[in-house]
Structures are given as structure tokens and as C-alpha cells.
Curated annotation (Swiss-Prot):
It comes from Danio rerio (Zebrafish). It catalyses: L-seryl-[protein] + ATP = O-phospho-L-seryl-[protein] + ADP + H(+); L-threonyl-[protein] + ATP = O-phospho-L-threonyl-[protein] + ADP + H(+). ATP binds at residues 65-73, 88. Belongs to the protein kinase superfamily. CAMK Ser/Thr protein kinase family. SNF1 subfamily. The modification Phosphoserine is found at residue 218. Its EC number is 2.7.11.1. Residues 1-41, 548-587, 697-776, 1060-1092 are annotated as: Disordered. GO terms for cellular component: cytoplasm. The modification Phosphothreonine is found at residue 214. Residues 59-310 form the Protein kinase domain. Residues 739-749 have a biased composition (Polar residues). This is Serine/threonine-protein kinase SIK3 homolog. It is an enzyme of class 2 (transferase).
Amino acid sequence: MAAVSSGAAAAAGIPNPNPNRERPQQQQQQQPASAALHPVAHRSAAAACRPPLARVGYYEMERTIGKGNFAVVKLATHMITKAKVAIKIVDKTQLDDENLKKIFREVQIMKMLRHPHIIRLYQVMETERMIYLVTEYASGGEIFDHLVAHGRMAEKDARRKFKQIVAAVYFCHCRSIVHRDLKAENLLLDHNLNIKIADFGFSNLFSRGQLLKTWCGSPPYAAPELFEGKEYDGPKVDIWSLGVVLYVLVCGALPFDGSTLQNLRARVLSGKFRIPFFMSTDCEYLIRHMLILEPSRRLSMEQICKNKWMRQGDPDPEFDRLIVECEQVKVERETELINEQVLMAMAEMGFDRERTLQSLHADSYDHYSATYSLLSDKLKRHKNLCVAPPTPRPLYPLQDQSNAVSMTVPQVQLINPENQIVETDGPMALDSDEGEEPSPEAMARYLSMRRHTVGVPDPRAEMQEDLQKLAPGFPRVAPQAPFPPLMPALAQMQLMPTPSLQPGQQLEYKEQSLLQPPTLQLLNGMGPLGRRASDGGANIQLHTQQLLKRPRGQSPLVTSPHPIPAVAPVDEEGSDAEPDPEAVQRSSYKDCNTLHLPMERFSPVRRFSDGAATIQAYKTQLENNSLIRQLKQECEQLQKMYAAPQDERLMEHTQQQHVLYQQEQQILHQQIQALSLGHGENQPSSHLTYQLQRLRIQPSSPPPTHPSNHLFRPANQSSPPPPGGGAGLMQTHGGPSAVQYQHGSALYQSPSDSPPPTSLPRMALANQQPSVPPGSARTLAQTLPQQQVTIQVQEVELGGGAQRQSFLATPCHRVLGKQLSADNAETHSRSLSRFHTSAYEQLTAQLLGESVMGSYNPYLQGASLKVPGLEGYGLSYGGPSALQQALLSPTPLEYRPPPQVTPTLQGLLSPRHSLTGHADPRLPPQELAALLKRHSRPAPPTAPPTIPQDYGEMLLLQQLGQAAESLDSAPPQATPTQHYHHLLQIRTPPECPAPSLPHSESMEEDEMPAYHEGLLAKAAAPCTEAHELLAPPLGSTPPYSSPTHRHAYLRSATATRESCADAADAGMESDHNGYGSRSTQSDSYRPRGALQRHHTIQTCDDAYEQVEPMSGMSLLAGKALSSARMSDILSQSSLTGSQQLQQREGPVCDVDADVHSSSCYPSSCTTDMLLSYKTPDLQYSVEQAGV
């Protein structure tokens, strides 16, 4: 390397006045260099006696400010210009030929780079064993230390810094230079806090399209292709590192981190990192497109410079000028005009003008060019240039000065700028760079927090031990007095005492052999943030083990009387009026535009890689902190002062609610007793309809979305039924209902509000139950939960007994099976929850008499339709009517469903359409038909008591047999020819969100039949302890769990949807009566969390990570998929039932259309029937049951 001189004196370019003393001067240079390279070995010796002051050429060595892979960086002062410089000292004896070539390549590359945001090379000196690289000194320290001391940067400040970084990296790329070790530790700040990129030890030259293959750099900043061991494009690697750097600037934390190198590698290769809430969308876009796994898809430097986020804020003409200059590759900064003012100043110092010009044109990087560059930089900073009086020999005035003072201090303390070895005479001292001393908080952490770049593997495992030994040719010098007299002899220079080797802030050149866990003096000594960001996996693992061995207790930062400056604001003046550091720190976190490191004490941000040990230590610190206890005591005092009036008002409100509840219950019981006492033998037969109306059993209601919905109608606007007959009450598809949904207050109408009609007689009830053959439906009913429904009854004018008999004997319950409503069930169950057991027993006693009185337990299914004592009543009107007994009596134990489920109910009431995930436990309509016919048909007046039993059993068997035969392709039953009026209809449900299935953005758009489950609550023998038909809901049911909900339910039907929302929020599904049951969701679906930017994990391939990821799916794709799932359910299953029930559908129906009941419709004709079928006299519609 021609540019590297063969000796320090020769490299200085100054004629040696005493050639015989050149060798002692070299020995004087070698001694401190050895000490610099082996601080551990010399530490004990330095404690007893400090080594003499070292001078290399025209530079006075001061302290160590950095340690690299193969070198040590020392802070020095140029003896002529008094400028601070950083000297990188490389021991050639410790390098093999390959690494030595890299050192020469670094020198060559730094000569090519003259940029305001790149550390500049001033001079190169070489001895037999050492290479000295004199570089620019950045007094602001690393940007990493700046982030530690001040927290994350606001995006405005981060943009300014990042622009300078991009300009410098772009400048390198335009000159075919790739850095390959960009990280926060290699980004330095000068005295004006401008960026200076340092450490080109891993840089290399590249050509367009050429791939590199050397694994180097810092693991947290390394691109994924480096971890994969592939050949890589150099500029793309730098762009990935730039993305990590920008994330660190804006967030104050690393996007990829791990406890070990393997974990870190896995996270980098996954490409997933966290985007905090405070990051802007434009900044996020820029980072995500720099951190893309595929190198070819990453942004180029030109695209980064033109990015929207980079162009925000005030205009930056300096950045634009630098970018234009980068694009002009052929324009070199070395062609700048020579500054005559600097040349004149050097001539006054005794430098030869011609030799200086020759050195500048030849890029010699000797003492002449170094002095010129330092003076030129000083002129740019201070705008004036004051020089010392001219002297032909620059070294002699230094030797004659006896007032040059130096002071040795402990390693961890700071050097007093007033005690530096400086030239105090002459005007040059006024313009010295003493003001560029590193910031105190940065200087206090240099050695204790050094982290190391992982470079090319070094086979010499014993390098550290060799470095600790004193190499041959580095003789020791006997200790001298601290302030010896300075004699005018050049050999006496080695007797000058040297300041202690101390941490600095300049030019880190990491050394792999020095990978050791750092001494933690940061952030309470807790967590991974106590270490440097670029540490490799080995150091991280040792550091974690060191953490685990530490005792858990109060943080030393909290108890220490002298907080470490790393976490507290720096008190430059040392004034006692400054607030408590913790108070200042807490106040700084209130600023929403700044973010401190995650593990700082009051920081709201937690590092993604923080482990359990860190959390536990933080919790222990909080528990032991006296400030927390003081806040708790203050909170308790405030509660005692202000909580009492609130509790009193709450108790008063609760008492009022309780009184209202008792009054309503008392009025309800009185009305029931008045109704039961007023029943007589000659009471009009239409009292049945009136009683069912009081029990909230209403005629059919309009669709939930219809303008005449009951939710929007007053309480007393339900129109009475028309007297014409049942046909007039029916409605076409989508048409308004003839009888509007009645408000909940109708439950408390007095008997005088509407006189009961007088046309329907009351029926006696047979006490004998027919036996039903067990089938497949029995097994289905045994394994499924019971449901409850409410039936609406239309008032029907019937003729004589024959007409009534034929009406009840025909299968005409299509509307009943079609319009089943979960809302009716919830409303009915809610109203019946007001019934107390004793009140129900009183009602039963007054309705049936003492002889037929039986105890009623609303939570047991032990009671049945077999009422003792009713056998002998015959046509007596003293007992309850058939529908009353059918609706108010518990389900019998021996009652069994038929073996098949009708296709209509499969379509309307299938588990998929009910959105609950359960199978269908509802009672098929043929059972209800048989039940109602058996109870509604009056027995002949002259028949013995057993005839009604036989006839009722015959009717039920006939109806069940007809339904079963129609589904099994058996010969159909004989059907009457006349048309019949429908007696029962089921209301449609209100809008209710489905809590369990994957839903689209609006469940109202899908309009699924959310809770269509069951006609009558039917229990088989194993289900005897399920809920009865009209049983009150459990007290723990979410909609009824509080008095507020109970009163809200009585006053407005809109609470149905609120209760469903409550059940869904609790993670429970509500059945028709509000009973909660754990939802059975599929494994592929998990509820979407709140879309908080800070709880979102980014994917480098432009996609958010799902909570449970699906391959290649972004958040928007997952959102669309969620809607698609719902649409698939609606389109594939339609109204014919779920896939499970479709497999059990019966053959094609062969019953005539005139008497085609819903119980025998196959799946092939269900859809057409629901949408278009209509009997001549009997109108009905499908009321938004998911069609």
C-alpha cells in the first residue's frame, strides 16, 4: 500500500532534527499502543503507576474510546491545530494476510469517501508493528447512546437524521462501495448532532449485478439472505439495515431481537415485526418496504430518496444537493479549490507550501495533508482561523512549555477539559476543539456497554490471551513522577504522564474475540435492553444467564443515591434546584411525541423480546417502591372521602328497583288469581284466546326489518283480530301483519281491557298418553339441549263439532313450523320468570281443583300430561282447555319424537342457520299436531271416561303414522277435501347478532335465522332435568343476571339484542331462553381482536399477521374470507338444512298438494314451497328466516 508510510516520522512529513533518536521515539509510540491494545493486562500496573504519555507523530494520545475487531480507537489531540481526532491503532502482528488486506482495503475506501456525513480519514501512519489511522472525531457519540439518554426520536427529528444517513449511504453506493455494517453504534453524531457514518472495516467494492458472499455485520441488523448463507446483493443488504435503523430511530427498540442467535435468526427469517401505535402510516410504509424478505422487492436508494415520508416537513436543500451530487459519480470532492487562507496559516506555522500542495494532489495522507484538512474543517466550523506564531520547528515549542498540565483520573470518571495537555499560549487555543468533548452520559457508558459486531470467523481462539501478553519489542518503562520537568530533548517525551484509558464515543471497531457480557449500568440493570443492540447470539446467551443469577429485588437504580446518567436527564450545571431524576423521567414520558426505551422504568413500551425474568423484576420493583405504596394510600383516602355518597345513591337506586320488582310481581300474581277465579263452566269459549294473549302468545308478527316492527310501536297499538276468520289473518310473503307485535306491557293488561270472544268451547283433557314408537329422533333429542319456544295463536271462528273435529285431525301446522321465533321464546321465558312456584301452584289448584292438583316444579320434567282426576270429567268445562294444558304443562316423560325431522324444519331450523353450532333439538311439527289434536278434540257427551282417552290416542297415532309414512314412502293417509284454518303461528325473531360463527362485518346483512330452535321444548327420558316449556330462566343467565337487565327486559323488547350482545361478549352462546352455553367454534376461527396498531404484527411481505395465521393471507384478505365463509353457509345450505341433516332426508313426497303439510315436504321442494306456495284460503309467508 503506497499510501501507508514506513514510519511515523516519515509519515509525518517533517524532517527529523535528531535522527539518532528516531528509534526511541518509535519505542515510545509502541509502548502506549500495547497498553491500548491490552487494557486488561495493564490495568493492575496502571493502578500503581500510570504509564507515560504517548505521542504518535503530532498527536497526543488521551484515552480509549472504542474497541473493534482488530484494533483499538483512541482519542487524541493534534498538537498544532489542537483539533480532536480519533486514531485507530491496528496491531499488524495479530492479523493474518487476509485481515491485513482488509485493513488496507478500509484505508483505500475511506480515501475515496469525502462526504459531510461520513467520518473522514486524515492521515495514515505505519510502523513495523502498528498502523495508525487518524480519522475525524465525532464528539456527540453514538446515536445509540443518544437514544438511550433521550428516548426515541420524534418522526421529524428522525427524518432529519435518516436523510443524512441515506445521503451518505447513497454516496457510497454511487461509488460502488457497500458498507455492510450499518447499525446504531456505527452512526455517530458531531457537535451539531449531524450524522457521521463510521467503521468501514467490513466495507467492500462491488459492481452492478455482482453478488457478494462474505457473512459479516451485526445480527440484529443483518438481512435474511445473510442468515441463509446465500450470495447477496450488497446494496440490498445496506437497504435492509437502513430499515432497521429507521425503526430504531422512530421506536427506540429493535424490530428483530432474540435471546439467542438462533431465535434472532428465526425472527429475521420470518420477517415479522411489531408496528407501534405512534408510527405514522407513511413511515410504516417506508419501513415495511425496506424490510421485505425478498431482496429484489425492497426499495432502491432512489425510491427511498423520493419516498413520501422523506419529502414531508420543511424543504431540505442540503439533502437535495447531496443527492444530486451522489448521482454525479464523476464529480469528486477532491477537486475542490485549495483554500489559500489555510495554506497561508500553514506557511506561518513553518510548513512548506509546495510540499503541502504536492501532498494534497497525490493523496498522500501524510502530516501535511492532515494538517491542511484539520485546519480546513476548523475554518468551516468557526468561520475564522487563528494560528499560533510562526515557528520553523513545530515540536520545540511544546518541549519548552513547562506549564502543560495533565492529570490522571479513574477509568470511569470524566476528564476535566481544563486539565488536558493543551497549548495555553497563543491565539490558537481560543479556537481549539475542547468544546467537542463527549457528552457525560455517553462517556460513562463506553467501556461498560460496548457491543461487538460479528465479523468473519477467526480461527485463532486464543487471540484474547495473546493480546493480554506483552508482545516482544514493546519494552516497559520505569514509572516516572506525575509532573516531570520537560527537557528540550525529544527522547524525554516518553516521560510525560498519560491520562487514563477511558471510554469515549468515537469510531467503534469491534473485535470478535472480545465478546463478553457487558457490565450493565443501564435501565435498572434489567432486561435485554441493558446490552447493546447489535450483540451477537453468544453474548446474548451469556448475558441472559448472568441476569438469571442475579437476586430479585429492588432495582439498584431506585435505591442508589447517585442515579446513572443513562436513564436520568443529564444535569449539566449540577444545580441543586433540579427536580428528582425519577420525577423528570416520569414527566418526560407524558410527552406523546417521544418514546424511551422499553425497559426504562416509566416507559409505556415493552420490548417484543422481553422475557419473564424481566417482567418479574419489574413487578418486584413496583411492589417494593415506596412511591407506589404512597399512591395506594392516597387512593384509599380519596375513596373514603368520596366513595360514601356514591354507595348511598347506588343503594337507594337498587332499593327502588327492588320495590318496583315486588310491585310488578304482586300485580302479576293478582291478575293470575283473578283470571283463575273468574273461570266458570259457562264462560265464553273464546277465553282461551284471551288467556293466550295475556301469556304473550300473539298472532304472527311482521318481519324484523319491517317499518311496523314491534320495536317501533307503542304498547297499546296491537289491533284486535278481525272477526271474519283465520284466512283474513294470514299474510303474503313480506306483507304487513294483520296483528302487530304487542309491547311487553301488554302482559299486565287487566281483564277488562278486552272482553274474551265467545265462540270457542273448552275441551276436557284425557289423562292417558299414547305411546310413541322410539326412533332416530329419540337419540337426537337425548344428546341435545332442550329449547323453549312460544307459540302464537290466531283467533279462528269454527263451526260445529264435526268441523272442529276435522280441523284438529288434519296436518295443517305448516305455518307453525315455518315461523318459529327465538324472540318469542325469550320474551315468554322472561315473562314467566316472574311466576313464583307458589303462585303457579295456586293457579293450578284453582284451574284444576284440589282433586287434580299436583305439585309443580318449574325445573323438573317429572310432571306430565297425565293429570289425575280428569278422566271422569268428560265434557266438563271446569278443567283447563286443550291448548292451555298443552302449553302450560311440562313435557311427559314417555313422550317420544318421531324418527324423522321434516325438511322444512331442517331448512329453517338447522344448526347452521341458527348460528349456534348445535344440532336441532326441536320438536317436529307432526308431534305438535298429534298433541294438539289429542287435546283439542271434545269427547262425545255420552261416552264413558275411557273413550276420550282412546280417541285422543287414536288421533295422535293416526297423525304420527301419517307423518312417518309420508317420509318413508308409505301410502298416505286419507285426507279431507275441505280447507282448514290455521290455529297457531310462530313469530319471527328480531335482529340479533350471532355470537358463535365467523361473522361478516354486519350480521344484519346476512339476516340469518339466528335463534330458530325448537317448537316445543321436548325432553326424552335421559333429559328429564332439562328446562320445561315455560320454565323461568336461570338466575345466572347473562340477560337476567342483574336487576337492571330484568327491568329492561320488561320494558322494551330491544333488550333481546342487548342480551345477545352480552352473551357474545362473555364468550357464551345464549339459547332461546337465555341460557349460556360455551360456543363450539371451529378450530380455524378465532375472534378478531381490536385493531390496534400497536397490538398488530407486521409481515415484511406486505401483510399483517393473523392471530392464527393462514398462508398468504393479509388482514384485508382475512376480512374478506370471513365474509366469504358466511356467504358460503348461506348459499350452500340455503333452507334445506345442514349437511348432517340432509343425509337423512326422506324420499320424494307423494301427498296431494291440497293437504300437503309441512311435515312431509322433502328437501327437493322446500325452497319452492317457502318462496311461492300458497293455499287458496290459507295465506302464509316466510318471514325473513334467512332466505
